[in-house]
Amino acid sequence: MSNRKYFGTDGIRGRVGDAPITPDFVLKLGWAAGKVLARHGSRKIIIGKDTRISGYMLESALEAGLAAAGLSASFTGPMPTPAVAYLTRTFRAEAGIVISASHNPFYDNGIKFFSIDGTKLPDEVEEAIEAEMEKEITCVDSSELGKASRIVDAAGRYIEFCKGTFPNELSLNELKIVVDCANGATYHIAPNVLRELGANVIAIGCEPNGVNINEEVGATDVRALQARVIAEKADLGIALDGDGDRVIMVDHEGNKVDGDQIMYIIAREGLRQGQLRGGAVGTLMSNMGLELALKQLGIPFARAKVGDRYVLEKLQEKGWRIGAENSGHVILLDKTTTGDGIVAGLQVLAAMVRNHMSLHDLCSGMKMFPQILVNVRYAAGSGDPLENDNVKAVTAEVEAALGNRGRVLLRKSGTEPLIRVMVEGEDEAQVTEFAHRIADAVKAV
């Protein structure tokens, strides 16, 4: 188990202006990354960002650090995270860097690296970068300094890639779609992908101003999308998050369709088309209704820890191709190397068109179990509530009452002193009562 100082499970992230998301830190990060990556070769680095105002500052700092280490940088401008992974592969770049805090508010930002094959940097490379950051910055000889350039048609290349994941024999001509781009990195891409495939597109969340990313729009807040779908009498809505690696959908009645349901639709269609290899990977938070629906289809299902990184690891371990979190991270390894909201959405649209079915009807084969989540704050020095005898006893009582038609999950937050209590089962009133019973036991510790 590595003991890294800066890199978390999803790169480096924080509030802009507070360590580590400061200009001096990011400059040194660029230099350290440049020193380490230069050992592997002298190819350029691709840098993409979302629409946060801080992206300008941070990409300049990164580029300066890389140049001092002798590596050149190519900027994509605002670009979805999965697009940077794709461009890194196609340009055979030494690495890709994304400046984004995904679904977080504008005042946060982060930095994530992709390796030459469009996957996460190996742990040992991240550790080498951290080790380099302990040293003083040195500059290569002036004749060896890196340069900066801009990739002229980055968006066009990625649009064509996305369209290429949609079956050639199908068209979206019959569909009216509302797409919500979260005022984020997909604002100039997702509407064009859908239009070029023939859809009648109404775009919202496509007016980024640097500070409105994810603000009451996008995959984390679909209320505006739900209202617009109903007002426009659209066939469906598609919501992406700030960096385009998540997708949540809305059916023609305004019902939310989450990552579990999206994976169910894609897995079932893959089975029908004879293209599903193995099973599907969800997380500890995936709805039990997904597990049961896949079981009825004969599709194996495995749960990973929460986090798209762990979903990907489980897929690689099993040799399977499809995984998802209910938050909307959908990973389709036969199409791409990372979660891609646009590509996942297109596979659902293909299932709709091919089967002449609405999104609502495609979801009907999966019954979502009521799932109640209660967050309980505890005193940091009061011991581990999960080891408390009374908490264990109450949890065991609830599990016995639910039997094999429900689940209980207690887990600690990774960032604050919270216990997350999740209970799911067939009866919402019962599940709610059980969740609060366990939460009360945790509070009493």
From Swiss-Prot:
The active site is at residue 102. The modification Phosphoserine is found at residue 102. Gene3D superfamilies: Alpha-D-Glucose-1,6-Bisphosphate, subunit A, domain 3 (3.40.120.10), Alpha-D-phosphohexomutase, C-terminal domain (3.30.310.50). Pfam families: PGM_PMM_I, PGM_PMM_II, PGM_PMM_III, PGM_PMM_IV. One of its GO terms (cellular component) is cytosol. GO terms for biological process: carbohydrate metabolic process; peptidoglycan biosynthetic process; UDP-N-acetylglucosamine biosynthetic process. Activated by phosphorylation. It comes from the Bacteria. Mg(2+) binds at residues 102, 241, 243, 245. One of its GO terms (molecular function) is phosphomannomutase activity. It is an enzyme of class 5 (isomerase). Catalyzes the conversion of glucosamine-6-phosphate to glucosamine-1-phosphate. This is Phosphoglucosamine mutase. The lineage of its organism: Bacteria, Pseudomonadati, Pseudomonadota, Gammaproteobacteria, Enterobacterales.
